[in-house]
Each structure stands twice: as C-alpha cells, then as structure tokens.
Amino acid sequence: MNSIKISGLVGSSEYDAIADDSLKDEDNAAWVMELEPCVREEWIERIGWIRLIDRLAENELVDSGSSEFRKFYFGWKWLLLWGRVKPGCAYQEILTRIAARWFGASSTPVDRLSLWSWNRYLKAIACYHGHNLIVDTLAQYETMLKDLGGAYFQVLPFLAPEQWQAACYFGALDQFFNNLRDIQEDAQRGICYIPTDVLNQFGVTREEIIQQTACQNPGYSKMMQFLLDSYLAELRQKAYPLITADDLHPSWAILRDWSVHRYQRIERVFRECNFDYTQFPQQYWSEVQQDLPLLIAQVRQQYGTARKPTNRFLKRNTTRMPVLLRTIGRKVVKVAGTVLNRPSFSGQESS
C-alpha cells in the first residue's frame, strides 16, 4: 500500500543521536503506514512529536554543548503557563501545532488528558535522560516505566478516556521491553537502568553491566530470571485490561497486537541468548528484518478487509494471560523540518 516508511516521516537517524533508529521505528510502528490516510496522519503527527523530543534529548547526551531539548521544553512550559506560544521561541511551528490541537475553548476531555500526559512525558525525559542516572529501587523503576512509556502511549491518538489508565500500564510494559532490548546500547553510553536494589540482591554491580562483563557473574542470570519470570508477570497483569480489550479503536487494536508480538520476539531472543545482552542485538535485529515484511503483509490482508475494533491481525489466546508479554537517531536542525514538512503539515495526503 505504501512505499514510504514510518521512519522516513518521523526523523529517524537524521541527526546526531545515540543510535541509528530507523529500524527501531519500523519495528515499533511500520503498521501505521497501512492505516487509512486520515487515521494514518493522526498517528504520524503524534509519533513525530514524540520522536522529536526523544532525539533532541539524546542529542544533548552526545553533544554537551547542545541545548535543543531545553529550548523546546522552555517553549512548552511557556505555552502551558500562558496558553499561547511565545513569539520567536525555538520550535515555534511545532508548538503552534500542539497548541492548535490541545488548547483553546473547544478542547475536549481527551485533549486535556493528552495535554497532561504530554507534560508528564516531557518531565520524564528531562528527569531520566542523563549519563549519571541511577534508579535506586524497583518501585522507582516502575515509576520511570509509567512516566516514560505510560505517558507516551497516553499521548497517542484515538484513545478513549476510559482506556487511559490501561494504556499507561501497557506503555510501562512497552518501556520494560525497550529497556531489555537496549541493555547493551545503554551500557555503551554508561547507563544502567536496572535498579540498585535488584543489582544488590543478586550481587551484580552497575559497573559490570556498563563494562559488559555482567554475564560472567553467576548472579546475573539469576537476576534476569527474576526480572523476566517474576517482575514481568506483575507488569503483564497490570497491562492485561488493555491486552484483552475488545472495544479499542481499530488502529489501537493493531498497535496492541503488533506490540505483543514484538514483546514475544524480544523475550524469546533474549532467552535464546541465555540473557547475554552483548549477543542479543545482532540476532534480534536480524529477525526483525526477516519478520517485518511478513507482518506488514498480514496487516494489509486482514486490516484491509476488516476494520472493526474487534478484529485482530495477530492471533492471540484471550482465554488466559499471554505467555509473553521502545526511539532515537541524527541532525537536530533537520528534525523539526522533517516533522513539519511531511505531507500532513502541508495539507497533502501521503501515499
């Protein structure tokens, strides 16, 4: 249906950041390009805003002289305080788009919820993007998952107010799997998100994770078994209302099923690698490249003929808890242009 990829519309890998994330964006959201144009544009807009923030923040990590995220955040806080965009501020055009979407007398309850979640997401980015980040406890870790992944999912379009809390827990689950997928990538930039109390419980050090020697510590495997067999079960349980919901918007049903399939793949490959996060990336991304064309073909076939919320493009067993149950890229000055110059911002329909 579409030769244009989602990564090409949300600024993937177009400026200095930590990783080439075009494949991550395809793994997360390639299905968006198969939606009806009017629905697709809503998703691309929100994902574009979120990816912009991710990449501005990551640019500050790789370039100590950069302040692009802080410029955007200042402009946002002005908008939040005064209800209007500060003239001449950085990223004025994007902030104006956000203001038009969520502010004003005609704003709906969903708009106000989205605004609240967007503010929560920006606060989380400001809090958790740093070289010296240390998460002390498992409870603090779950708060981080909800502040980042939960708020992210709540900003996405076509989410009903009654599904807001469920989306937060599903987003937290998503963030957990993104963190699992990116352990090596984070270690390479000196970051370990595993809470200190969990590391201490199993005799693993933060330095071992960052130096990529943790797999040599017998306690590391036990720690990962705890996180995947015990803690993950709790996250799944909290996300279960959305996983089993039968009244989601059709696009959300696809997001949910696509994501669950992705979580299954991440966990399976991680276990096949015996929790070795240094071996995981090569095997995982190779599987993603093989898997994506098949998944897209399935979306095209099933979504093209059945667009009701109760349809599923990936078969799931809803009679029990599923057994198994994250970007970021290159050139800050191009990011805003990428988001603003895409077809939906110029009044054209993408193909």
Segments predicted by a language model, with ranges:
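Catalytic cores of Mg2+-dependent Asp-rich isoprenoid enzymes
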Residues: M1-A105, D111-D174, L180, E185-S351
